[in-house]
């Protein structure tokens, strides 16, 4: 897929992997829409991309709020053009320190599901139709190794990510023949604020670099043969793009 002059919408785009991917996307010549809740962080991210010569637009919104979904998709398309790539990256751990399921409030589980699962479903549902009409598009759902491992105290997050992986497979099966690919990406443990909140004592030197993972995702987008629709891609197993 040629990324120059495409529109890429990235949720959770103001920091971590989302920001790294937004910067990498802009460097390819893509127009990038970043979605985040914090206006200050979002404005700083957009300014950083523009200062480097990229084309970026920020949208302050919470993907866990169903009232924001149509506004996100509509504003991104109105300002930057039809969306070619959707990256469902926004995520929440729930309350930290992380809790065992016995200590997890139903409301906290509901919030994690709204952001990590229902939000991606809603955005994909709004955007994938227009992608199919143009016979092209990619949806990337950012997953986690917690989706396939039973880590104590990661229950709410793990449940949401496991469901997101299966949602990816169902979307892919239902969109066969439309030109739209839907892929899960497990980026692995990365040196991000979110990881530090989950595991405060982790050694940053042992964690992955969001910039490297972003470069790998860009390489995957450029070459559709590297990731079939409906697959779960694990960043740790990818070769480093040159």
Regions found by a protein language model. Name each.
Residues 39-40, 60-72, 106:
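The beta1-alpha1 cofactor-binding region of Rossmann-like NAD(H)/NADP(H)-dependent oxidoreductases
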Residues 129, 172-174:
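Alpha-helical segment proximal to the catalytic Tyr-Lys
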Residues 144:
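Residue(s) in the substrate-gating loop at a strand-loop-helix junction
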Residues 177-180, 184-185, 192, 200-242:
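C-terminal helical subdomain
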